């Protein structure tokens, strides 16, 4: 009986998908951060995953300072979901709507409160278009946002804006991104996908 109980508990714990804690390094202004290792998010029980590569630069959640006093800031229980969302907004393999919905799913799986999920979703849904278009413009200009391994040891006193300019001068470009990866279809809903 005890063995069955332990197996059930293990199954419950492992079935609660969460995004692993990222290992990041800040740039000098602590506005932008770089992933020191890949982060892979298994989306619900779908069997599909999003991997944000080592070297990706994120600002976590782009929440205006005016909202920080209301308990929302760039860093919170939604930070891991924000990294996934930043990557989806940068790579643009999914539509903006799909990226926003995957953010909701990731926040739900991270245990973010319903009120916070709703507030952040409203922000990206209504106000994220400028970031989406800005990212497209930067990608069209072939600006990098994924730092190759050989450039990950940057000085502690450099900002992302400064370091990015150095990378551009050296001809660093992002890898090609997959168009319409299989996980995008999960963004046609805001519900955590079940098995199958």
Predicted features and spans:
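Extended terminal accessory/targeting regions
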Residues: 16-196
């Amino acid at each position: 009986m005890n063995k069955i109980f332990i197996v059930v508990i293990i199954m419950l714990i492992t079935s609660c998908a969460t995004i692993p804690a990222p290992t990041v390094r800040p740039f000098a202004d602590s506005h932008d951060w770089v992933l020191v290792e890949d982060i892979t998010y298994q989306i619900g029980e779908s069997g599909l995953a999003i991997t944000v590569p080592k070297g990706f630069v994120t600002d976590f959640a782009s929440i205006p300072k005016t909202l920080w006093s209301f308990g929302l800031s760039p860093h919170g229980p939604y930070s891991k979901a924000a990294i996934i969302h930043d990557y989806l907004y940068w790579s643009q393999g999914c539509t903006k709507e799909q990226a926003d919905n995957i953010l909701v799913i990731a926040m739900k799986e991270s245990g973010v409160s319903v009120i916070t999920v709703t507030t952040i979703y409203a922000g990206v849904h209504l106000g994220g278009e400028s970031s989406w278009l800005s990212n497209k413009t930067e990608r069209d200009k072939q600006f990098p946002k994924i730092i190759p391994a050989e450039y990950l040891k940057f000085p502690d006193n450099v900002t992302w804006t400064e370091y990015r300019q150095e990378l551009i001068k050296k001809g660093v470009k992002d890898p090609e991104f997959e168009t319409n990866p299989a996980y995008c279809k999960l963004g046609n809903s805001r519900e955590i996908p079940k098995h199958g």
